[in-house]
Amino acid sequence: MIDKESKISQDSFFGHPLGLRTLFFTELWERMSYYGMRGLLVLYMTIGVVGNPGLGWSNIEANAIYGIYAGMVYFLALPGGWLADNLLGYQKTVLYGALIIMLGHFTLAIPLEQTFILGLAFVAIGTGLLKPNISSIVGQLYSAQDERRDSGFTVFYMSINIGSMLGFAICGYLGERIGWHWGFGAAGAVSYTHLTLPTR
């Protein structure tokens, strides 16, 4: 006969609500794709058009575009949060954000200069929808009196560190050693993975 403590351990994620497992892996895959792609951006924009061809832009152009992109990621969190609060709800906003991020990464994987800015725009918009709202869902897993709340956020934030480390390593290797668009495509594949893998 299974005692109560064993039953709780089977129906939890490191002693936390099972919903944290879904959010942990969603954030891990999203951060892996985001940082994996981000690590390639300036290199891809400034590398010449021979060999493993990039865009061949100047450092000034590349840094300006990178800065605008990074700024938009954080700015778009404001309308992303508003949409979740007032129109769509947190779960739908996170899902739509993940889908748009995936679309952006696959657009970046197309070896055309004309689609590059479009892909960046998709990733920025999707991140603005997903990033501010997924943490809110973590908070909703716990009551205000639940002592596990702080440690739950610690577990959740571990996914950010793990995902960023894997993203830089995997997408960076593919981008530099095989081809930039393989790195961008890997980021898209990671996005697809976190949308399709079973979470229970």
Language model features by range: what are they?
Residues 115-130:
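Hydrophobic core of transmembrane alpha-helices in multi-pass small-molecule transporters
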Residues 130-143:
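Intracellular juxtamembrane helix-capping segments at the cytosolic ends
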Residues 193-199:
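Conserved small/polar residues in nucleotide/adenosyl-binding loops
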